[in-house]
């Protein structure tokens, strides 16, 4: 079973993604901010992370940089409520960029592609 970590400061987004992905057979761990994600990373050992860009404290971009220091090949999907960052995601060393909640089918398809399940 593939393991996914959802990192988002919005509780409703975390639980929506968790419910949808667990229905598809994924094991899901939640983190409400970047520091919590870093703390859980070595214990949960996710196969993929979805990471919100704008969060209080350590934002998604800083969290991504910290993760990449040790996890260069871990697929990471950057998420934002706005499409304004789409052109920047490759410079951050992320694997994909999605607008949050725009299309859960797109989220699930992107996850499957990055995990080699399609």
Protein language model regions, located:
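Short amphipathic alpha-helix used as the core "switch/output" element in two-component signaling
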Residues: 39, 61-72
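Short hydrophobic/Thr-rich beta-strand motif most characteristic of the beta2 strand and flanking loop
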Residues: 25-32, 40
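Acidic catalytic/metal-coordinating carboxylates
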Residues: 32-36, 59-62
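Active-site residues of response regulator receiver
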Residues: 52
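Receiver (REC) domain active-site loop signature in two-component systems and cognate sites
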Residues: 55
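Charged docking surfaces used in two-component/phosphorelay signaling
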Residues: 15-23
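Alpha4 helix (beta4-alpha4-beta5 surface) of REC/receiver domains from two-component response regulators
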Residues: 62, 83-100, 105-109
